From Swiss-Prot:
Keyword check for Repeat: yes
Compositionally biased spans, kind Polar residues: 304-316, 518-528
Gene source species: Mus musculus
Xref: InterPro entries: Ladinin_1
Record-given protein name: Ladinin-1
Basic and acidic residues: compositionally biased ranges: 134-173, 218-231, 267-279, 495-510
Keyword Transmembrane: no
Chain intervals for the UniProt region annotation (Disordered): 1-404, 492-528
Length: 528
């Protein structure tokens, strides 16, 4: 249990480090944007006098500067003042951070790199070969500082979340656009990989975080030799910055205040459920990737192949996980806790972290319930699994409830379709058999003299109309087809009865008129 607790604490600290790393990346981009704005304002004054500086700026613009030059004209003095205030608070925090780092473990790379970055002038920022060098150095330094700053990272998260919320209200779109360009410039290899590969790498980021951290530590040691820098750069950029891009886009879309606590809640909820599986997987990742960090970059490239195979397994499971999000944590339905899967479904890396070992490590898992559950997961389609496998399982209640929830909508859909087909068939048959309906009327009508009298005696149809309808209404408890036919026949007979009564009334009115006409003529004759 102690080993699993250590693994879980390491995973949670790595998740916190990832959120802090993304926030630090946004800070760095804001600093760079502010530096570019100051460099453009400094370059505007000597443009009139020095033609050489103007040509050099026009000759070597980087992709980031080209994007920054578009939103720079609407930037006003108020925004510059806000940026300067944010930069001041960051400098104070950076000094505090350096003091704590000096107490814990003195890292000399961070102040040196920051001095180099702060000493960059407006002429040097426009040159291209310095820009990728700065970015390559930024990755390991940031990761090292985050690993050593584990215990007091929560206080920094709160302060940074407040400032970032203030800053992102003003310029959210620019940060998203520049984050994408920064990640695309950092990873030339990641441009070859398609978009679903990026998602899968981001979803496998939580279990494989330890290995990437150890590789970054080895990268800082090998950074000083320029020969080894190029293959290590490709191996790290394939693993680390690609999930950063998706995670940054997730966090800029969602409010940043909410993301770290939701991550922690999801991790804590899954800690009670899948502790053994994830501890085994984390130990496997740790062993393989620590040995990988000690070896040459060729083995780093070789070890990416099993990662891609794991990604292909995740592709086979991904549509099923999206169609049925209840199945992603297996034991969560056994404990009947619906709240954790809803929280974990917001973050796809965590849900697939639980799902992948259930298929990969069937032989390693000791618990029999998970074995039966994963064997049922391997079936062809989830709907057929749920109610075919449920009578065989006695210990778990989840497939019964799940089969009920799956069966009801399927059965209602089938009944609705059948009813629609019946109604259409009835309408067609009525439209076809409407001329010959007089035959069926005599056969279907209930027996009785009062009900058949209106067929022969039209004079009494108005009086006897109420009796047959009541008799028919009592006898209408039949099948749907017969009732529909009877209703049609009743409506037709009512129409015919109404026509007959109208004819009787017309005849009566004609006779009355004739009588009135004869009466005044006779009276006139009598008067004469």
């Amino acid at each position: 249990m102690s080993v699993s607790r250590k693994d879980w604490s390491a995973l949670s600290s790595l998740a916190r480090q990832r959120t802090l790393e993304d926030e630090e990346e946004q800070e760095r981009e804001r600093r760079r944007r502010h530096r570019n704005l100051s460099s453009t304002t400094d370059d505007e004054s000597p443009k009139l006098t020095q033609n050489g500086a103007q040509r050099s700026v026009e000759r070597l613009p980087s992709v980031e500067e080209a994007e920054v030059s578009k939103p720079s004209p609407p930037a006003s003095k108020d925004e510059d003042e806000d940026f300067q205030a944010i930069l001041r608070t960051r400098k104070e925090r950076r000094q505090r951070r350096q003091v704590v780092e000096a107490v814990q473990a003195p890292v000399q790379e961070r102040p040196e790199a920051e001095e180099e970055r702060d000493s960059l002038g407006p002429e040097q920022t426009s040159s291209q070969p310095l820009v990728p060098k700065k970015k390559v150095e930024a990755l390991p330094r940031r990761r090292l500082s985050r690993e050593q700053r584990g215990p007091w990272a929560q206080d920094e998260e709160r302060l940074k979340n407040r400032e970032l919320a203030e800053g992102e209200k003003r310029l959210p779109e620019e940060t998203v656009a520049q984050q994408k360009t920064l990640v695309s410039e950092k990873t030339p290899v990641s441009e070859k990989t398609p978009v679903p590969a990026k998602r899968l790498v981001s979803e496998k980021a939580c279990p494989s975080e330890k290995g990437t951290a150890t590789e970054k530590a080895s990268l800082t040691e090998k950074r000083h030799s320029p020969e080894k820098l190029v293959p290590e750069k490709t191996s790290v950029t394939e693993k680390s910055p690609v999930p950063e891009k998706t995670l940054v886009s997730l966090k800029t879309a969602a409010p940043e205040r909410r993301s770290p606590p939701v991550l922690e809640k999801a991790i804590v909820s899954e800690k009670m459920q899948e502790r053994k599986l994830v501890s085994e997987k984390a130990s496997i990742f740790e062993k393989s990737l620590v040995s990988e960090a000690k070896l040459t970059p060729k083995k780093a490239a070789v070890s990416e192949q099993p990662q891609t195979t794991g990604g292909s397994q995740a592709t086979t499971r991904e549509p099923r996980g999206r169609a049925l999000p209840d199945k992603s944590p297996p034991s969560s339905a056994e404990q009947s806790t619906p709240a954790p899967p809803t929280k974990a479904s917001r973050f796809p890396p965590i849900t697939l972290q639980v799902k992948i070992p259930s298929k990969d490590e069937d032989a390693d898992t000791p618990s029999p319930t998970l074995l039966t559950y994963s064997s049922s997961l391997k079936r062809s389609s989830p709907r057929t699994i749920s109610f075919r496998m449920s009578p065989r399982k006695d210990n778990s209640e989840t497939p019964l409830t799940r089969s009920a929830s799956v069966r009801l909508p399927a059965s209602t859909v089938k009944l609705g379709e059948k009813l629609e087909r019946y109604h259409t068939a009835i309408q067609r048959s009525e439209s076809v058999r409407s001329p010959g309906s007089s035959r069926t009327e005599v056969l279907v009508t209930p027996a009785g003299v009062a009900s058949k009298r209106h067929l022969f005696e039209k004079e009494l149809s108005g009086q006897n109309r109420t009796e047959p309808t009541s008799i028919r209404k009592e006898n209408l408890r039949l099948s749907g087809v017969v009732t529909s036919r009877l209703n049609l026949w009743i409506s037709k007979t009512q129409d015919s009865g109404d026509h007959g009564s109208q004819e009787v009334r017309k005849e009566a009115s004609v006779t009355k008129r004739a009588q009135w006409g004869s009466k005044p003529s006779t009276s006139l004759d009598a008067e004469v």
